[in-house]
């Protein structure tokens, strides 16, 4: 623990909320005959990316009449998706979901690939090169990726040096679509 904090000028408190059903129209539009495709949710800060991601995870994990349940692995580095307490998610993330809480994304993605047999791996707010490398590795193993990133649109994302090349490697241009 960092005990060197002092002279604090402000504190920001984020209160997460669950919005069940939020992801349903999006999942209907994305779902393909062979399952869930890798999906990157782009939006500016503060508009609900994490709330949407959590509901997508829950819906994929639980399944319904149109979609079978998926095995989902979450790498919840900052504890915002599942809000784990004593090993139990305090927010709904679905019945078939494994959560790695407080684990760095790159390490967690690798751990899930090796031990959890996920069909989908979900992470919130990707920012680091090592996270992208781990995601590319997972994509090459046949696992669908579900992630969020701060960007208003594809053009802004393409201007981020870290992601410009990765966009080409992760998805086929014919499958890029705006929903």
Task: Name these PLM-found stretches.
Residues 1-37:
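P-loop NTP-binding catalytic core
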Residues 41:
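Hydrophobic anchor at the beta1->P-loop junction of P-loop NTPases
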Residues 113-120:
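Proline-aspartate-enriched helix->loop->beta-strand connector
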Residues 45:
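The conserved Walker
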Residues 168-179:
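Residue-level detector of conserved catalytic or cofactor/ligand-binding positions
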């Amino acid at each position: 623990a960092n005990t060197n904090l002092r002279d604090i000028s402000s504190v920001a408190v984020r209160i997460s909320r669950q919005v069940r059903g939020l992801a349903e129209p999006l999942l209907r539009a994305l779902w393909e005959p062979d399952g869930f495709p890798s999906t990157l949710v782009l939006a500016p800060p503060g508009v609900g990316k994490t709330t949407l991601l959590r509901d997508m995870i829950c819906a994929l994990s639980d399944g319904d009449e149109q979609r079978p349940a998926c095995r989902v692995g979450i790498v919840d580095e900052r504890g915002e998706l599942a809000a784990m307490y004593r090993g139990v998610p305090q927010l709904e993330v679905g019945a078939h979901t494994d959560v790695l809480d407080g684990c760095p994304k790159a390490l967690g993605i690798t751990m899930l690939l090796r031990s959890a047999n996920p069909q989908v791996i979900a992470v919130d707010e990707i920012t680091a090169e090592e996270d992208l490398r781990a995601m590319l590795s997972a994509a090459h193993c046949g696992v669908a990726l579900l992630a969020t990133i701060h960007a208003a649109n594809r053009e802004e994302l393409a201007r981020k040096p870290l992601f410009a090349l990765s966009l080409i490697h992760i998805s086929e241009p014919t499958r890029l679509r705006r929903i």
